[in-house]
């Protein structure tokens, strides 16, 4: 492992010890904000320090074992220990490099998931419903919580557009690579002649930002319209103007919310989604500027970026970003999408490591 990496790990270990002492300090314990910040930093260093300590111990064990190589009675055992430890050290060094990669501060946040039907008419709406079901089942398997923010159902089933909030551990970090164009190839239920059609939906995943990180939105930049809810809501449907539509005039972003019976709650939900979309627009602008310099697995943010195809006749799913194909379409549509998500994350980390090597 490079001396520069070892030096950085030594510094992180020292900081970890310093934080441990600070968290036992009475003045820090009395200051909730400071205690919370130090606790968070301490927790973030736990894994890298523990892994580094294991790496140091294995290297120390190898040095001790090498001293026994001249002893005929101990040579075989020492050689075996050295071989095993070197293999583990190699794995630890790869893991440490990944742990040292720059972290996306948004990864730990909850996420807004937006699915919008694209080309393909009614079939696109049905596919949007299929995608929503897929992500819902995946969220359930992770014990994440799903809360509907806004839904516009299509006539033949499914959705013209649906926005949900998914809450849980590192939701955005797991789902952020799902943003882009999703294409389906199959015989629609409405097709009488058995012809295969191609339809598409766009998926956008945005982090739910804490209030402290939300962009300042000038109220003068907003147009807020209220109207009667057309969705579920029992006796309150179409009796009060509880639904809210907010237009951000500078960007043209429009957010609607009618899920709650309370206009106040719908407005709060819509503003939260709007803030995330405004931040996303800025991130997309930056991504477009960087797109020519290095492959960007997160995409440029362009909703037309085709990232995945679901081919029903062949029972396959293909991720076009890394040329990955799996022939378990039924399982994927039932929420078993880790085998699609994890390879993308791994590839992204490999790209980050390559970028760091280029800079070295």
Curated annotation (Swiss-Prot):
The modification N5-methylglutamine is found at residue 235. Keywords: Cytoplasm, Methylation, Protein biosynthesis. Methylated by PrmC. Methylation increases the termination efficiency of RF1. Transmembrane segments: none annotated. It comes from the Bacteria. Its main location: cytoplasm. One of its GO terms (cellular component) is cytoplasm. One of its GO terms (molecular function) is translation release factor activity, codon specific. InterPro entries: PCRF (IPR005139), Pep_chain_release_fac_I (IPR000352), Pep_chain_release_fac_I_sf (IPR045853), Prokaryotic/Mito_RF (IPR050057), RF-1 (IPR004373). It is found in: Cytoplasm. Belongs to the prokaryotic/mitochondrial release factor family. Peptide chain release factor 1 directs the termination of translation in response to the peptide chain termination codons UAG and UAA. NCBIfam families: prfA, PRK00591.1. PANTHER family: LD18447P. HAMAP family: Rel_fac_1 (MF_00093). This is Peptide chain release factor 1.
């Amino acid at each position: 492992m490079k001396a520069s990496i070892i030096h950085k790990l030594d510094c992180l270990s020292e900081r970890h010890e310093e934080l441990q002492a600070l968290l036992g300090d009475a003045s820090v314990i009395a200051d909730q904000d400071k205690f919370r910040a130090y606790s968070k930093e301490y927790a973030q260093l736990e894994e890298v320090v523990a892994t580094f300590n294991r790496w140091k111990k294995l290297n120390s064990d190898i040095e001790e074992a090498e001293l026994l190589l001249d002893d005929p009675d101990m040579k075989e055992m020492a050689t075996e220990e050295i071989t095993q430890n070197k293999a583990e050290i190699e794995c630890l060094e790869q893991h440490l490099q990944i742990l040292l990669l720059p972290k996306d501060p948004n990864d730990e946040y909850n996420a807004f998931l937006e699915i919008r039907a694209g080309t393909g008419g009614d079939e696109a709406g049905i596919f949007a419903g299929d995608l929503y079901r897929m992500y819902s089942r995946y969220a359930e398997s992770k014990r994440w919580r799903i809360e509907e923010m806004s839904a516009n159902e299509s006539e033949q089933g499914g959705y013209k557009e649906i926005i949900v909030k998914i809450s849980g551990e590192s939701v955005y970090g797991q789902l952020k690579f799902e943003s882009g164009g999703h294409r389906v190839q199959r015989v629609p239920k409405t097709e009488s002649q058995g012809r295969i059609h191609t339809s598409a939906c766009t998926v956008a995943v945005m982090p739910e930002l804490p209030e402290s990180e939300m962009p300042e939105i000038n109220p003068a930049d907003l147009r807020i319209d209220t109207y009667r809810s057309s969705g579920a809501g029992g006796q309150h449907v179409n009796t009060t103007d509880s639904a809210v539509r907010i237009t951000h005039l500078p960007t043209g972003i429009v957010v609607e919310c009618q899920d709650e019976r309370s206009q106040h709650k719908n407005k709060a939900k819509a503003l939260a989604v709007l803030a995330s979309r405004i931040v996303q627009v800025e991130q997309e602008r930056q991504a477009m500027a960087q797109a020519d310099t290095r492959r960007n697995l997160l995409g440029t943010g362009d909703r037309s970026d085709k990232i995945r195809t679901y081919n029903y006749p062949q029972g396959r799913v293909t991720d076009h970003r890394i040329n990955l194909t799996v022939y378990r379409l039924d399982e994927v549509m039932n929420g078993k999408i880790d085998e699609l998500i994890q390879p993308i994350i791994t590839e992204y980390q490999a790209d980050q490591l390559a970028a760091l090597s280029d800079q070295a």
